[in-house]
């Protein structure tokens, strides 16, 4: 199963790369290479169309992005752009994981309260939903002002984007057990705590993993957004802002940072998916 999934991901990435270069072939800027990738073979190509969105400034060639990854991040430094972005990705991942865990715990706690106290659910769930209507790019500077320009603000933003899907999915999962199972537990004088641990929580695990896969990528997005106004010293958000200032002269660097950010989100999603497959062996997955 895992080999098929890995092959599917590899095929998807290959198709994206083919579509990318096909767009350049048809509507990009003219190509001229005196020695392509150091092979000594040169060629020239003049695309039949001129589409601004496919120009080298808007959409660099994949091999130009790869070349930028292998080049020094700054002139005179031994560190390559790839090494710099890997370090930035690890920094972002640290903030995202903390926000992911805290957001998941908050979401599960809120869902548990709402399931057991319907009055609180009717009173507060609309506000939980309304909180997600606030644009995160507008909320992030306010969080930075309130909590300071450090990793704390980044973690809070990642938590903010994580708790909502977990809350909604956990509410559905905790409400999913067969009522007869709950009545059976109560017939044995089980209290709410026992029913929660032995019936409700186990039944909610498939729903939780569906939400956690969404929250994993959301936490990466939140961490990257938070690193912009957060004033942190590293991270992919900081790299994206820095490279955006030099986009006219070096668009490949910004695209490299974007691609690494995407790979980080895919990696985090994959890790949660592996945990789901391991813990839910033989159980049917659900979609929320």
Task: Pin down the residues of each PLM region.
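C-terminal transmembrane helix and the adjacent membrane-cytosol boundary/short C-terminal tail
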Residues: 175, 255-288
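Pore-lining and gate-forming transmembrane alpha-helices of multi-pass membrane transport proteins
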Residues: 9, 95, 214, 222, ...
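Conserved small/polar residues in nucleotide/adenosyl-binding loops
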Residues: 1-2
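Transmembrane alpha-helices
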Residues: 156, 160, 193-226
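Short cytoplasmic-facing helical segments at TM-TM junctions of multi-pass membrane proteins
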Residues: 166-208
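Generic hydrophobic transmembrane alpha-helix motif, especially the helices
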Residues: 125-165, 172-173
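Periplasmic/extracellular loop-to-transmembrane helix junction in inner-membrane transport proteins
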Residues: 28-101
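Transmembrane-helix boundary motif in ABC transporter permease subunits
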Residues: 98-128
């Amino acid at each position: 199963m895992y080999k098929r999934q890995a092959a599917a991901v590899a095929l998807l990435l290959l198709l994206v790369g083919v579509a990318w270069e096909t767009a350049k072939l048809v509507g990009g800027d003219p190509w001229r290479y005196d020695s392509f990738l150091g092979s000594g073979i040169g060629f020239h190509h003049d695309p039949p169309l001129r589409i601004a969105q496919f120009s080298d400034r808007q959409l660099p060639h994949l091999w130009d992005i790869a070349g930028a990854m292998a080049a020094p991040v700054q002139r005179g430094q031994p560190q390559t752009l790839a090494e710099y972005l890997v370090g930035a990705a690890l920094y972002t991942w640290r903030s995202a994981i903390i926000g992911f865990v805290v957001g998941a715990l908050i979401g599960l706690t809120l869902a548990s309260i709402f399931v057991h106290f319907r009055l609180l659910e009717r009173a507060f769930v609309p506000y939980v939903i309304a909180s997600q209507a606030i644009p995160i790019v507008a909320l992030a500077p306010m969080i930075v002002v309130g909590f300071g320009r450090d990793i704390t603000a980044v973690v809070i933003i990642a938590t903010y984007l994580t708790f909502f899907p977990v809350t909604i999915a956990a509410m559905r999962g905790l409400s999913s057990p067969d009522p007869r199972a709950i009545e059976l537990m109560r017939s044995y004088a089980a209290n709410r705590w026992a029913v929660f641990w032995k019936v409700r929580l186990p039944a909610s695990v498939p729903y939780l993993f569906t939400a956690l896969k969404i929250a994993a990528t959301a936490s990466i997005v939140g961490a990257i957004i938070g690193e912009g106004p957060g004033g942190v010293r590293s991270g992919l958000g900081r790299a994206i802002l820095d490279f955006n200032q030099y986009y006219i002269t070096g668009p490949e660097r910004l695209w490299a940072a974007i691609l690494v950010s995407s790979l980080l989100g895919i990696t985090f999603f994959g890790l949660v998916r592996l945990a789901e497959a391991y813990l839910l062996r033989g159980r049917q997955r659900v979609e929320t």
